[in-house]
């Protein structure tokens, strides 16, 4: 694992486990903008973080959230604030900001298929200026969809 940037891949090469570990290490805040969320382990890690007192906000693609496999309702039932983008089909981001210290991003959809079948990538970046840029983008998206 690099000091400032770490790379992970799928299928079955650590991307999902790394994302779950990233979430489990957060102690203050998690902001996530995702296209799809159907991976049970990622869902459970977000719920566990919320139960530990971590402030969790999730912005999802509206059309994907309507899938019967989507975990958005499970997050809401656990008390996590979930917004769906107002322009259905336009949210294709896949990033997470942890404790305002690191960003996880890449092509990796938060799904079982991405973990087990698809060729995907996931980066963790620990550079303050990159984290700030992602936070500004998340805050803008959150405000636009509130």
Model-derived regions: residue spans:
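General small-molecule cofactor/ligand-binding pocket signal
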Residues: 8, 81-85
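A general structural motif
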Residues: 9-15, 39
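Primarily the HKD phosphodiesterase
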Residues: 19-81
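Short, structured motif recognition centered on aromatic/hydrophobic residues
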Residues: 35, 95, 134
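Short gly/pro/ser/thr-enriched loop/turn and capping motifs at secondary-structure boundaries
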Residues: 63-67, 89-90, 111-112
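Short, surface-exposed coil-to-beta transition loops
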Residues: 90-92, 117-118
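Short beta-strand scaffold segments in enzyme catalytic cores
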Residues: 94-97, 123
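Signature of lipid phosphatidyltransferase scaffolds
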Residues: 102-146
């Amino acid at each position: 694992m690099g000091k400032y940037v770490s790379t992970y891949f799928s299928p079955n090469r650590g991307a999902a486990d790394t994302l779950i570990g990233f979430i489990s290490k957060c102690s203050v805040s998690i902001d996530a903008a995702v296209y799809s969320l159907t991976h049970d382990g990622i869902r459970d890690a977000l719920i566990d973080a919320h139960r530990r007192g971590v402030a969790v906000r999730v912005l999802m693609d509206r059309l994907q959230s309507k899938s019967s496999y989507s975990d958005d309702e499970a997050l809401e039932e656990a008390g996590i604030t979930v917004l769906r983008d107002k322009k259905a089909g336009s949210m294709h981001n896949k990033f997470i900001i942890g404790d305002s210290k690191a960003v996880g991003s890449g092509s990796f959809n938060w799904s079982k298929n991405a973990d087990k079948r698809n060729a995907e990538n996931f980066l963790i970046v620990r550079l303050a200026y990159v984290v700030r840029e992602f936070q500004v983008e998340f805050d803008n998206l959150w405000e636009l969809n509130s």
